[in-house]
Amino acid sequence: MLYTQAKAYLVGKLKEAGLKTKPYTTMKSLSRSMESHVGAVLPGTEMIARNGSKTIYQDQEGAQHKRRKLFDRNVTFQVVLGEYTDDKVEAMLEKFLAALDQGIEVDGNFVPLAAESVEWSTEEDHPLKAEVAVTVNITFRGGVYRDIGLHRARDYRLEDIGKNNGKEPANGN
């Protein structure tokens, strides 16, 4: 769900930043675009690494659970903004960056996000009709988790504790 929710989040933030057209989500449709005022959320890379960290937490009913993080997932998207002038692209970029939150919630887990790099290009450097374009790499740092319920032992009785002076019992004695 991380990929889907992160993509939808970025599309929404592009609209908040002042994009008037529907954001593109594939490079093929973006390169075919004849618009000069353009925005896109394109898939980037995903890094996966094994992680074995554990934490114990209580749910809303008070039951304790152990959550194990099986994998780290770093999903990167490329957000493209294009416009006629540098000033308009920069204004849209600043609105977009200002609209970004610290992270998003995915399946009850907080997933932080970071804007990692920005690349500017002119019409000679990209296939868009826009005069100036900027590409921002946004990375979401999430994970794959497994929850296990913790059960407390109840109704147990200690029958007998025997001391054998350091000798091993023979035949249960």
Region roles according to the model:
Residues 41-44, 116, 121, 159:
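A structural detector for beta-sheet-dominated domains
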Residues 67-87, 128-142:
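Oligomerization/assembly interface segments of phage tail-like spikes and tubes
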Residues 90-149:
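Acidic-leaning, charged glycine-interspersed low-complexity segments
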Residues 1-60, 162-173:
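Small/polar-rich, solvent-exposed N-terminal microdomains that initiate assembly or binding
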Residues 56-65, 79:
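A broadly used, surface-exposed interaction patch
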Residues 3, 7, 86-89, 93:
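Generic alpha-helical secondary structure
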